[in-house]
UniProtKB/Swiss-Prot annotation:
<dbReference type="GO" id="GO:0006730">
    <property type="term" value="P:one-carbon metabolic process"/>
</dbReference>
<feature type="binding site">
    <location>
        <begin position="233"/>
        <end position="235"/>
    </location>
    <ligand>
        <name>NAD(+)</name>
    </ligand>
</feature>
<comment type="pathway">
    <text>Amino-acid biosynthesis; L-homocysteine biosynthesis; L-homocysteine from S-adenosyl-L-homocysteine: step 1/1.</text>
</comment>
<comment type="similarity">
    <text>Belongs to the adenosylhomocysteinase family.</text>
</comment>
<feature type="compositionally biased region" description="Basic residues">
    <location>
        <begin position="32"/>
        <end position="41"/>
    </location>
</feature>
<dbReference type="InterPro" id="IPR020082">
    <property type="entry name" value="S-Ado-L-homoCys_hydrolase_CS"/>
</dbReference>
<dbReference type="Pfam" id="PF05221">
    <property type="entry name" value="AdoHcyase"/>
</dbReference>
<keyword id="KW-0378">Hydrolase</keyword>
<dbReference type="GO" id="GO:0005783">
    <property type="term" value="C:endoplasmic reticulum"/>
</dbReference>
<dbReference type="GO" id="GO:0004013">
    <property type="term" value="F:adenosylhomocysteinase activity"/>
</dbReference>
<feature type="binding site">
    <location>
        <position position="207"/>
    </location>
    <ligand>
        <name>substrate</name>
    </ligand>
</feature>
<feature type="binding site">
    <location>
        <begin position="375"/>
        <end position="377"/>
    </location>
    <ligand>
        <name>NAD(+)</name>
    </ligand>
</feature>
<feature type="binding site">
    <location>
        <position position="319"/>
    </location>
    <ligand>
        <name>NAD(+)</name>
    </ligand>
</feature>
<feature type="binding site">
    <location>
        <position position="262"/>
    </location>
    <ligand>
        <name>substrate</name>
    </ligand>
</feature>
<keyword id="KW-0963">Cytoplasm</keyword>
<feature type="modified residue" description="Phosphoserine">
    <location>
        <position position="55"/>
    </location>
</feature>
<feature type="binding site">
    <location>
        <position position="266"/>
    </location>
    <ligand>
        <name>substrate</name>
    </ligand>
</feature>
Amino acid sequence: MLGSKKKYIVNGNSGIKAQIQFADQKQEFNKRPTKIGRRSLSRSISQSSTDSYSSAASYTDSSDDETSPRDKQQKNSKGSSDFCVKNIKQAEFGRREIEIAEQEMPALMALRKRAQGEKPLAGAKIVGCTHITAQTAVLMETLGALGAQCRWAACNIYSTLNEVAAALAESGFPVFAWKGESEDDFWWCIDRCVNVEGWQPNMILDDGGDLTHWIYKKYPNMFKKIKGIVEESVTGVHRLYQLSKAGKLCVPAMNVNDSVTKQKFDNLYCCRESILDGLKRTTDMMFGGKQVVVCGYGEVGKGCCAALKAMGSIVYVTEIDPICALQACMDGFRLVKLNEVIRQVDIVITCTGNKNVVTREHLDRMKNSCIVCNIGHSNTEIDVASLRTPELTWERVRSQVDHVIWPDGKRIVLLAEGRLLNLSCSTVPTFVLSITATTQALALIELYNAPEGRYKQDVYLLPKKMDEYVASLHLPTFDAHLTELTDEQAKYLGLNKNGPFKPNYYRY
């Protein structure tokens, strides 16, 4: 599949160009003291997506050692200090985590085995900004096996598993990330990945668009050598489309978020399992009979609603799109406006990708002990900033769980400060992440090896053939056997026997 230099051709006209405008406002970050005299790197940066995506299962919490990693002098066993992690001594534990993840990521391991002899990414210098977990480590090491040099930072302040970052640093990957970064730390880590003497990236792998945004703001000349951008999240994709619409996108970009393998597997199945895991670990709540409102009925919302319904919850849905709204109704959920149920629900979950979905007015009207959380990428969906006022008291009851108390004694339970719930408070299924990570790897290979002129300065969707290939790599895990078309059947349908089997407009 990867042996030919001729790669997949993406239909440049198939991208979804609908724009969702986000206000250019700075997000709320975890407030942590930084060393006096440090120059803030973040003052000119807006619209950050440093939402929470950390694991409750992490070997160490960020509070274990209050000394900032930036103030430590650390070296790995090879003598390299080109990294900044919480504690390099955690590398052995992190290596075990990575080895466990490899067992549930069959497609990436198969891709590593099939393509490492060819080295399709030889000469690639990839700078990445994603969630640094064991699954990401498997992706990074696969990219390295395929010939790429990588430098990596975390795409949000809570996502990093410290032991995994240490294991990557011990293996020689320049990683700049730790759990519980401050705002200044976040941008400093990204800058350390990008601003390196004698090393300049030629590929970007982003999740949320912050890395791309930083390079545009601080080092625009770097785009002269960058061949392309691969973006995973809805937030980052919207930012790319906005750049393209304004005529400011100067390199080709691949939209992984809207690929079939991301939308229908990562967004749906991942959230269907991890929403319950995150809520259980943080609240110990029984879901049977509880009233829940889910804001948004996209693939993430569908997964959340299905999981909660199966547990016996009474689920309401809010939605702006009449098509998604009709789907919710026919799936057995009651469609409401948030104001209609806000006084009675026990749990509020946002998954829209928009801003101020839950406002201070909504928060004021919630019942006592209502649980409020977000499982969309951005941390803008819940107006957490409006809760940071003198009349309200914040009480940290456990990691990633805050009680916000009103003067009359009413309290709400806010999870992960309104940031991404599932890996802030739990984990996500490794097998599902294998699907997304394989898609990212193939997108990087495609853009890096594409002949000049194949891709213009625009945002492209993955080709159907690539989606089908990713899916096929995961089928052996289930001992699944695909039916093959006969020549007569293929001719009747007008298809190639080897695919693609669906047109680009097909909705799975």
